Amino acid sequence: MYVDHMSTGVETSTQADEQYKEAKTLFQSASINLREWASNSPKFLENGPECDRTSAETMKVLGTSCNLTTDTIFTNGSHHLSFEVTTKREALQPVSRIYDPLRLCSPATLNARLFIQELWKRQKDWDETFSQSHQQEWSKIGENLTLLSSQRIPRYIGGDKYKLFYFTDASAKAYSAAVYLFSSVNGKTTANLVFSKARIAPAKQLTITRLKLLGALIGTRCLN
């Protein structure tokens, strides 16, 4: 039997201790040693044996990298990629390797996808060398993609009252939706981007009105 990593959450370190004991007992009954425990709570980790803890500072949850010390999430995979590319084939590789399920990095990745679409429209071959203008444009895009790994987003959003709002918009090149969570703590309200979706406009030209309707559609789907 193979058991991969599991992820869960509780409100307090006391509840975490109880869950740890229950999980250990349950898996031990099946002769499975549940180990490599990690948490953003130092108190919880101190209560458990050191042999059960992981030494890693960062972990992945559903493909999203998490820093347990700072309790932040970030996009991994762009800092070590080479953006010195000269062909469509080389440009597509770094763009496709950036994993961003929450689409929090859409402002940076959308420009890269639009660039790839432009190459297709111009019927560029896979290994055809970029023109000087395309090379300069890609250099700017690559710089923005490289910065993604340095961006840290708070994982925890506290509050006792919550409201979800979504905003949509469109241009001739793309349409998008952004979902914000408004939370209130002691009368102070904060807004955090929690999810977004951006799509490139089809190669067949559509009116701005239709693209705005498509933006409203994906915005509604984001909430449902």
Language-model features: locations:
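Catalytic palm subdomain of template-directed nucleic-acid polymerases
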Residues: 1-30, 47-49
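Mobile genetic element proteins and their domesticated derivatives, centered on retroelements
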Residues: 4-6, 27, 34, 63, ...
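Secondary-structure capping and boundary motifs in well-ordered enzyme cores
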Residues: 12-15, 54, 87-90, 159-163, ...
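Inter-domain linker/hinge segments that demarcate the starts of reverse transcriptase
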Residues: 15-33, 130-159, 214-224
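C-terminal reverse transcriptase regions that engage the nucleic-acid substrate
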Residues: 56-163, 178
